[in-house]
A protein has these predicted regions:
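Leucine-rich repeat
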Residues: 1-219
């Protein structure tokens, strides 16, 4: 497990700056972790990363990645990319609104998720993944998660326990506006299909935040 946590801006109105090295077009830290992680069975990371964590940039001279032994993947990513751009967009309700980013930014989040989806195609024994971002205290979390049959989820569902299900499970906590593009959607549906069959429970879940009173709000 690696924790390189960097607090997201509490005030979404703040101007964010790039942390990329001068002259580089992708995050060298993310790319290095991608190379390192390919020998792991469990990869848990809380960090400030970009798409090269999952897939090489066109500016890299690297072979196609592969995670032949990876069973558990949990990535907590910052809502601001290393380039300084937000993975999310939103409009403040008024001049006092400091946390309004809440919908996926097609220009930044989609390429990040496409890289993630492509990476899952190279994880043949993956049993679970959680890709999450805490956007803000009130806004809550953006999450995508998958569990193979018999693998316990990271939280309890409000409508009942599906951990005993004999099929794969794919969950989205992404708000009411953003939806995955067709490639991401279809690729994530294929995770574990070859090992466990085509049956799949797929759900879009409700809002989860630290301020919510729902049981779904806590792991």
């Amino acid at each position: 497990m690696f924790n390189f946590h960097q607090e997201a801006p509490f005030d979404h109105r703040e101007v964010t700056s790039s942390s990329l090295l001068q002259g580089t077009l992708f995050d060298l830290f993310s790319a290095s972790l991608r190379v390192f992680s390919q020998n792991l069975t469990t990869f848990i990371l809380d960090a400030y990363v970009d798409a090269t964590l999952f897939w090489p940039s066109i500016h890299e001279s690297r072979a196609m990645p592969s995670w032949p032994s990876l069973k558990k993947l949990k990535i907590s990513f910052n809502p601001v990319a290393p380039s300084g751009t937000w993975y999310f967009v939103g409009t403040p309700k008024d001049e006092e609104d400091t946390q309004f980013m809440q919908h996926g930014n097609r220009d930044t989040l989609d390429p990040f998720l496409i890289a993630f989806a492509k990476a899952t195609q190279q994880m043949p024994v993956l049993e679970s993944f959680m890709l999450e971002c805490e956007i803000g205290y009130e806004v809550g979390f953006f999450e995508l998660s998958y569990y193979a049959p018999g693998v316990k989820a990271d939280w309890s569902l409000d409508w009942g326990d599906e951990d005993a299900a004999t099929v794969r499970r794919l969950y989205y906590t992404v708000g009411d506006v953003w939806r995955p593009d067709a490639f991401v959607e279809e690729t994530l549906r294929d995770v574990g299909r070859e090992r466990h069959g085509p049956e799949l429970i797929e759900r879009f879940l409700g809002h989860r935040s630290w301020s919510s009173q729902s049981a779904w709000s806590w792991f």
